[in-house]
Amino acid sequence: MKQLKKKKDGDTEQRILDAAHAVFVRRGTAGTRMQEIAAAAGVNQALLHYYFRNKEQLARAAFERAARGLMPAVVQVIASDGELEEKVRRVIDLELDHLSRAPYLPGYIIGEVTHHPERAAQLIAAVTGLTPQDLGPRVLGTLRRQIEARVKAGAMRPIAPESFVVNLMALCIFPFAVRPMVQAMLGMDDRRFAQFIARRHEDLPAFFLGALRP
């Protein structure tokens, strides 16, 4: 009986987190009401507050969950010993595929970090499992060595590994972060936007790697 109660409680907490994630990602912390989350989760507000004392606690839990999904496996790919060209293609495929399934995620993350700068460290920890101080040496070390070797061989223009990563991620994330503007400016409906993103799987590796050739 106790095991059944514990499982039911766990299911309820997960249902609340699922509802909170959906609502926070669409509306942001400022635009979200606890009553809306309770209704989406199918619980009353008293039970909601039993699991999460206040909106801030629930917002932090929802943000951490969203942060884990922002760069699925990207950090591991960048830090790996794989060939540089393959890393670029893999990162692009991972990001475009994931963001196509979660198109509101970049706008939510950007908005939360802008209004709650302290969540930047939370984002890094959730995505990488590292502190901001450990991130550079652990993630960028291999990339730095690969770039330096390519530059020395005359196969690549010099670029800081930090710029390499930021430029690559920006090319993937930007169309989703400002999707309404992109669609309005280019006259795209949702179907054409999806086709546009599908083409970027081929266009981005060629563009990014071509820009680094000497």
Predicted features by range, described:
Residues 71, 75, 118-152, 162-163, ...:
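Amphipathic alpha-helical packing segments from all-alpha helical-bundle domains
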Residues 75-108, 128, 133-136, 140, ...:
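Hydrophobic alpha-helical connector segments
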Residues 1-11, 18:
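N-terminal intrinsically disordered/low-complexity leader segments
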Residues 12-21, 37, 62-66, 70, ...:
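Generic hydrophobic, amphipathic alpha-helix propensity
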